[in-house]
Amino acid sequence: MVQKNEHQGGQSQHSLFAAGPTGEERRRVQWLTAELERHNHLYHTLDRPEISDDQFDALFRELQDLETRWPELRSLHSPTLRVGGGLLEGLAKKAHSLQMYGLDNVFSAGQWQEFAERMARAWGGDVNGPLPESFWCDPKLDGLALEIIYADGVLQEALTRGDGEVGEVVTDAVRTIRTVPLRLAGPGPFPARLEVRGEVVMYKNDFAVLNEKQEALGLKTFANPRNAAAGTLRQLDTAIIGSRPLRFLAYSLGQALWTPAPVCLLQSEVMSRLREYGFLTPPDGRLCSSVAEVEEYAQWVREHRAAFPMEIDGAVAKLDNLEAQQALGFTARAPRFAVAFKFPAELAQTLLKDIEIQVGRTGVLTPVAMLEPVSVGGVMVSRATLHNEDEIRNRDVRVGDTVMVRRAGDVIPEVVGPVLEKRPENAREYVFPHTCPACGQPAYREEGEAAWRCENMACSAIRLRAITHFVSKAGLDIAGVGQKWIEQLVTSGRVQSPADLFTLTVQELLGFERMGEVLAHKFVDALARAVHSATLPRLISALGIRHVGEQTARTLALHFETLDELENAGAETLLSLPDVGPEVASSIHNFFNSPANREQLERFRALGLWPRGGRSGGGSSGSTGEGGLASGPLAGKNILFTGTLSMPRSEAEKLAETAGATPLGGVSKKLDYLVAGEKAGSKLEKAQALGVTVLTEEEFMTMLREAKAASE
């Protein structure tokens, strides 16, 4: 935080009239130092913040003011002299070759003007001439700071910022991030050593999808995209890291030994070079030619904040001239040539009218706050998640409270906490139900889990969610069979399980509201096509087995030829597979031991919905019927798509599946073909390094035609 420290005459007010700090001021500095260190640890190390950025900044400014007034109160471990938090013990540690500093903050146009004036004074215009007033500006990303080190264009090492001087080694994790070049793009020559600094983020839409998957699998959801990105990067299991949609956006350099590459003299040149080398950079960065233009840019970013694909919490301005940057240097914690415009958090106050329970497809009971509608970040919000019973208790949220609401990641509305000074006398503590609100059956909470679950798998709410999941993109992906139709069919009693869908007739559908003859025929045809085109991985995913998502379903389909084989697999066999742990193996065992599930599987078999996978390589029901192609160049092969294609990637994967191939989620030694479209990145490089056959989209289409011809 930047404050104007000078007073008229250049002397502190207190140096003239006070002998020293009061006892109260001493105690306040000690408390602020300890409290800020605690919050630093919670935020940077544990990713479990207890206060908002605005609250932290207010405490930080107060400590800075006191230390400026009484320098003798500043301790060697003051938070104003360091950046970030401590280090996790589970990761190796290494010193940065050059310290990774934080940024001082400004919160108004006046504070920005003061900062610019201080830069000019530090530059010494009388000796060095006027300070170059061009600034490179871009959005301030809210993620995890990272340094990636390249030697002669090849990725060597990656470190988190840590405490600024020593970071955590996360090289293997970073290699799984698709936006990180394993080898710099372009013909070269490349710098002998290049330390690329930037931020690991998760886009808001990706974050929403991840949390939906976590919730569907009964796993812990993340509070916001930053926590999701930080928690993922610190995972020790690279398979989990690689399955999550992290992105690295580069915005500066540490040490740069340019020879034999051309030298960059300006920050704007650095950004262009980073893009040439294959990095993503923060969107809408621009060169501003004056102090006033920088202020206009920061205001523009603030006004368009909601439109950015990732969370941002400000804008950054830094001198464009790198020589001037070097001349100005650093304070103990921040550069003198750069500053962050911090924006206030997007929060709103509203009335919590009630709390309702939503039942998920695996039976999870999720509390949902029913709110007086309020605009948060430009979006009207009337419902917000409260996550689970523990969160309600920990945040002391009561029905009738005025609560603070934010859009977590600018996507999912959540209740932050109550406004205690506005709490009415009749505010009611919420008692979490121990029975399911949909069916009235007992709920249970497993040891070590935060979620309560309905134990009645015949529950109407679970049934509705399960059938909706079965036809969704995470299941069989049956176009035209959406949730609204499922709700009507389930409510009517005609559809009580996924198998019932495939027995619907046009005549029956015509009896439903807004279902015309053309739509009814399309509905039935889509279900009929799904029987023949379904693949084993999609069917396994569609079944909704707890803890079994799309990637695990693919793994199972690679190792088992039919659902019969999967049902009969022993625990030892299951646990030998890469994505299967004790919980997953137990869930699979429990699913197939359920009489209701076994009955449904027999109905699928009778309908012809019984695809083959594993060693047969056919992948689809049609390998014994019309749709699948059990022979040809793609049969039994593992395939992956990367880059920009002429068709949606999901459509390309479907075509591959009908030709007998199995789409994978990442590059590995098991991959047979990589189909590379335009702007293919790190996947292409990794595949080439492993000797995987790389195809163009046209070559892939040729193989599809050959597969079709072989089946005729």
Swiss-Prot record:
Positions of Zn(2+) binding: 436, 439, 454, 459
Needed co-factor(s): Mg(2+); Mn(2+)
GO BP of this protein: DNA repair; DNA replication
InterPro entries in UniProt: BRCT_dom, BRCT_dom_sf, DisA/LigA_HHH, DNA_ligase, DNA_ligase_CS, DNAligase_adenylation, DNAligase_N, Hlx-hairpin-Hlx_DNA-bd_motif
Enzymatic class: ligase
PROSITE patterns tied to this protein: BRCT, DNA_LIGASE_N2
Skewed-composition ranges (Gly residues): 614-630
Domain of life from the UniProt record: Bacteria
Molecular function terms from GO: DNA binding; DNA ligase (NAD+) activity; metal ion binding
Entry's EC annotation: 6.5.1.2
Catalytic activity: NAD(+) + (deoxyribonucleotide)n-3'-hydroxyl + 5'-phospho-(deoxyribonucleotide)m = (deoxyribonucleotide)n+m + AMP + beta-nicotinamide D-nucleotide
Chain residues that bind NAD(+): 53-57, 138, 161, 199, 318, 342
Name recorded for this polypeptide: DNA ligase
Gene for this chain: ligA
